[in-house]
């Protein structure tokens, strides 16, 4: 990243005062989140996904923010409907989904109170061939392991596509916050 002109900073953002030492930024791509391995430490999920987000939102309230979110804050919908749209009411189920909505609400707060331009970037699974759902299924096929097919559909987009779209979203950020579902146009089973 340094060779590309990206200035990196290593910090434990949960430590008091650390956020104040970070430089101002015109644009913030907010990708902080705790998802996997949170069973038994749900307090940590809430701390990182909501409390820390509130601190970061306050610190960078003068920036344009693209905040990664998740489509799992939507209810399950029949496959034939094409899935949730940005107008679909949220119905988070479970600790992670609730904290994901909490993260959005922290950015909604600064967008509404301070005029911060925010885009809530909702996606489910960004995949590529080295990891993710495609890799998991391919590995099971290769190893002859059983594949759980109880969930017949999943919302997946290519990781490279997600990166390109996310960087273009700074120009779409608004106050109040804008929502963008990032998903493919077709349903494949």
Short names for language-model regions:
Residues 52-60, 106-107, 165:
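Hydrophobic positions on the long internal alpha-helix
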Residues 48-52, 64, 102-103, 158-161:
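Conserved cofactor-binding/catalytic machinery of classical short-chain dehydrogenase/reductase
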Residues 54-95:
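Conserved Rossmann-fold NAD(P)-dependent oxidoreductase catalytic core, especially the SDR/UDP-sugar
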């Amino acid at each position: 990243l340094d060779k590309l002109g990206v200035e990196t900073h290593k910090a434990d953002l949960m430590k008091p005062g650390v956020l104040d030492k970070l430089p101002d930024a015109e644009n913030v791509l907010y990708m902080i989140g705790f998802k996997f391995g949170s069973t038994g430490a749900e307090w940590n999920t809430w701390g990182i996904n909501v409390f820390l987000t509130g601190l970061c939102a306050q610190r960078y309230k003068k920036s344009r923010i693209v905040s990664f979110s998740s489509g799992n804050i939507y209810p399950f919908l029949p496959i034939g409907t094409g899935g949730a749209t940005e107008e679909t009411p949220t119905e988070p189920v479970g600790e992670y989904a609730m904290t994901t909505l909490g993260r959005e609400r922290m950015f909604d707060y600064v967008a509404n109170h301070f005029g911060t331009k925010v885009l809530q970037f909702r996606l489910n699974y960004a995949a590529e061939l080295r990891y993710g759902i495609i890799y998991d299924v391919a590995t099971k096929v290769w190893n002859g392991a059983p594949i759980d097919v109880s969930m017949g559909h999943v919302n997946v987009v290519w990781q490279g596509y997600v990166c390109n779209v996310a960087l273009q979203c700074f120009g779409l950020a608004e106050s109040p916050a804008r929502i963008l579902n990032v998903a493919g146009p077709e349903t494949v089973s």
